[in-house]
Regions:
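Extracellular/periplasmic ectodomains of large secreted or surface enzymes and adhesion receptors
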Residues: 14, 144, 148-162
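Short glycine-/acidic-enriched loop or helix-start segments at secondary-structure transitions
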Residues: 16-17, 76, 133-134, 152-153
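His/Asp/Glu-enriched, well-ordered alpha-helical/loop segment
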Residues: 35-127, 147
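Short, compositionally biased
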Residues: 135-141
Length: 162
């Protein structure tokens, strides 16, 4: 069937694990985010149901893509972690977040590292196939083949480079 699932799992939210964000978000804003996310019993209850559905559809061969309605750039990390918690392998989640999503959106020059495509990628300090949370350990960012000056961007926008 020509069916694609873009899960939006109601996981614990980024507010429950914010230590890694301390260099990019002001402390007062972090506290507000934590307060807004702390008690979400309905979301936590529905996570189990949605995780079972995602796992079953994945096993049945339905194409799984990637997306989040989180407005923060770090929400993608949490969504990948939630997809692994739901039963997908880190390799399946990475494929969904990169090549599968690019294919779904018909953006042919991104999504995989292949000669002739735009060289947009990140370099990690640890293997995300071993632990999906390693996607947070970003060493370098490349856009169209050029390294991004993360420290310069952080200084320019009032935050840290990490």
């Amino acid at each position: 069937p020509n069916v694609v699932l873009v899960p939006n799992l109601p996981g614990p939210g980024v507010a429950l694990d914010l230590g890694w964000l301390s260099g990019t978000v002001p402390a007062g804003q972090l506290a507000e985010m934590q307060a807004a996310q702390r008690d979400r019993p309905a979301a936590q209850e529905s996570f189990g149901i949605q995780a079972r559905n995602l796992n079953r559809l994945n096993r049945e061969g339905i194409t799984i893509s990637f997306g989040t309605d989180g407005s923060s750039p770090w929400a993608v990390h949490q969504e990948m972690e939630d997809m692994v918690r739901a039963g997908m392998s880190p390799a399946e989640v990475i494929a969904a977040a990169t090549g599968t999503s690019a294919d779904l959106l018909e953006i042919g020059d991104i999504g995989t590292i292949v000669a002739g495509k735009s060289a947009d990628f990140i370099v990690l300090d640890a293997n995300p196939l071993d632990d999906i949370t390693n996607t947070r350990q970003i060493d370098a960012v490349y856009l169209r083949g050029s390294a991004i000056d993360r420290e310069g961007l952080g200084a320019r926008f009032g935050g840290a480079s990490q």
